Design a protein with these regions (language model features):
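Mature catalytic core of soluble alpha/beta enzymes
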Residues: 2-8, 20-336
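Sec-dependent N-terminal signal peptides
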Residues: 8-16
Length: 336
C-alpha cells in the first residue's frame, strides 16, 4: 500500500509539474513581425503574443476596407465616388471618424489643416507621378473657391457639399488613422505590447519585450540629398508620433530650378514658404490626430507653430528649421 501511495504521489507531482511548465510556456510572449505594402508605402508591425498568431490576413483585410472607404487613388472607393458627384453614398464608420477628426483639427487650426486643399494639390501636380505644374494666379483664385472644409457637411450618413466640384482628400490623416485601426485590432486580440508603423506614422503600446525597455524610434535629419540619418532618438510610452517634412516630398521647377514643397498654404493656394524643415508631434492620442497636427504645424510660420504647441499642452513637439543664416536648428517643447 505504501509503495502504491508513493507511486501515486509521484505521478501526481509529475502531472502538476507538467501543468506548471506548460502554463509557464503558454504565458511567454513571443515577437511577431509583419512587413508589407499599403497606401503607397511600407508598413512594419511588431507585436508580442503568447500564441505567436500571424494576423497578416486580418490586417490586410483592414487595409482593404480603409482603402475602399478613403482612398482617392481607388476609383471605386466611397470618397472617389463622392468626389465625382455621387450623392447616394452612405459613408461607413471609417469615413465618419476621419471626417470628424479632420473637422476638429480644421477648426483648431483656423483652416490651416483642410482636406479640401487637394483640388489645388492636384493642380500643382503633386500627385505621385505627375510633373510639377505652375497654375496661373487666375486658376489658383478660381480653385480657392472650392477650398474650405466648412463647405462640406456630414448629415445623416451622407456627405453634403455646397459645390459639387469640391474635392475631398484625407491623405494627410489616413495613414495615421490606418495605424489606429490596426492598433485597436491588436488590442481586441489582447495584444498589449506592439508598435505599428505605416509610412513613418507610429503608435506604440507597452514595451519592447525583447529589450525589456520602452519602444524607441528615431527622428530623421532633414537631408535633401536623399540620404538618411537620425537627428534624435526618442522613447514612446503608450503614445503616437507623426512627422511631416518638406525635405523628401518636393518638386523642382525644370526652368527656374526652384524647389516647391508639397504642403500648400490653404489661404493662398501656393506652396507654403516658411523656415520649417520637419515637424514631429507626439501625444497620448490617436495617431490620426498627431498626423493631422503635424501636417498643420508644417504649414505654419515657425513662431505660429511654437505658439500653437504652447496652447496645446497635450502635444509634444520637435521642430527642425533653418535659421536666418541657413543653418539647421531645433526646437523642442518643454514637455518633450
Amino acid at each position: 500500500m505504501k509503495l502504491g501511495l508513493s507511486k501515486a504521489l509521484l505521478i501526481f507531482f509529475w502531472i502538476v509539474g507538467l501543468s506548471f511548465f506548460s502554463c509557464k510556456k503558454s504565458n511567454e510572449l513571443h515577437p511577431v513581425k509583419l512587413v508589407g505594402q499599403a497606401f503607397g508605402t511600407e508598413f512594419h508591425i511588431t507585436y508580442y503574443d503568447t500564441d505567436q498568431r500571424d494576423l497578416t490576413k486580418q490586417v490586410d483585410s483592414l487595409f482593404y476596407l480603409i482603402n475602399k472607404s478613403l482612398s482617392t487613388y481607388l476609383p471605386t472607393s466611397d470618397i472617389s465616388k463622392i468626389n465625382k458627384g455621387d450623392t447616394s453614398i452612405f459613408v461607413d464608420a471609417y469615413f465618419k471618424e476621419v471626417f470628424q477628426k479632420s473637422e476638429k483639427v480644421y477648426n483648431e487650426t483656423n483652416g490651416i489643416f483642410d482636406p479640401t486643399i487637394d483640388v489645388l494639390v492636384n493642380a500643382w501636380g503633386f500627385g505621385p507621378q505627375n510633373p510639377l505644374v505652375r497654375p496661373d494666379s487666375l486658376k489658383i483664385k478660381e480653385l480657392l473657391t472650392l477650398v474650405g472644409f466648412d463647405k462640406v457637411q456630414l448629415t445623416n450618413g451622407k456627405i453634403i457639399k455646397t459645390n459639387n466640384s469640391i474635392y475631398l482628400g484625407f491623405n494627410a490623416i489616413a495613414k495615421g488613422y490606418a495605424v489606429d485601426v490596426v492598433a485597436r485590432f491588436l488590442e481586441s486580440k489582447n495584444i498589449m505590447n506592439y508598435l505599428v508603423e505605416i509610412g513613418g506614422e507610429i503608435r506604440a503600446r507597452g514595451n519592447n519585450q525583447t529589450r525589456k525597455s520602452p519602444w524607441k524610434m528615431g527622428i530623421e535629419e532633414p537631408n535633401f540629398d536623399g540620404t538618411r540619418s537620425l537627428k534624435k532618438i526618442i522613447e514612446l510610452k503608450d503614445e503616437a508620433i507623426a512627422t511631416s517634412g518638406n525635405y523628401r516630398k518636393f518638386k523642382i521647377d525644370s526652368i527656374s530650378g526652384k524647389k516647391y514643397a508639397h504642403i500648400l498654404n490653404t489661404k493662398t493656394g501656393y506652396p507654403s514658404q516658411n523656415s520649417l524643415l520637419s515637424v514631429s508631434v507626439i501625444a497620448k492620442l490617436d495617431c490620426a490626430d498627431v498626423d493631422a497636427y503635424a501636417t498643420a504645424l508644417m504649414a505654419m510660420p515657425l513662431e505660429e507653430a511654437k505658439f500653437f504647441l504652447d496652447k496645446h499642452q497635450e502635444l509634444k513637439g520637435f521642430l527642425i528649421y533653418s535659421n536666418n543664416d541657413g543653418n539647421v536648428e531645433t526646437f523642442a517643447t518643454s514637455n518633450f
